[in-house]
């Protein structure tokens, strides 16, 4: 049986990581079974989280725990079984998103790491790195509104959406940058064109898949 491979994508909102994850999935499925999972997408917990955020019910600790519940559900029902069946699993955000988002809310990062210690580490993690300024410009050009969670509205309620976005995503970036060495992130320059980024990613993944037989 082919060996399952876990590929994770991380990056701030507006970095383009989701688009890259989808492009990679489309390429891989031409040759292998592939499954794409996204952060906060559990069948039964997603709507609960959405409603709790809308009503501003989440403290930093409950924010951490409820997202861990979402992840553990997807991990046990989809990610792990797919890997055991030989699938290539692409995760649009993985446990490192929790490390960053929870810790900037004041939750001890070592506690968060223990909370997610049941999860296996990815075979490769791509960190699509762009500055918050560039990410903000991309969102503005797309003509969509900044989501409250993208601006850290729960921890920076007094700031405008744009100010909150820059401050919050800046803090997230600082955590990601600290994780690069310890978690063996492959740092990708997110300012390159989507095509250039995808070519670079496929080179890494192609070698990984070839070695998974």
Swiss-Prot record:
CDD domains from the UniProt entry: TMPK
GO cellular component term, pick one: cytoplasm
E.C. no: 2.7.4.9
Catalytic reaction(s) noted: dTMP + ATP = dTDP + ADP
Keyword Nucleotide-binding among UniProt keywords: yes
Single GO biological process annotation from the record: dUDP biosynthetic process
Sites where the protein binds ATP: 11-18
Keyword annotations: ATP-binding, Kinase, Nucleotide biosynthesis, Nucleotide-binding, Transferase
Coiled-coil intervals: none
Pfam families according to UniProt: Thymidylate_kin
GO MF, one annotated term: dTMP kinase activity
HAMAP family reported in the protein's UniProt record: Thymidylate_kinase
Protein family: Belongs to the thymidylate kinase family.
Protein name according to UniProt: Probable thymidylate kinase
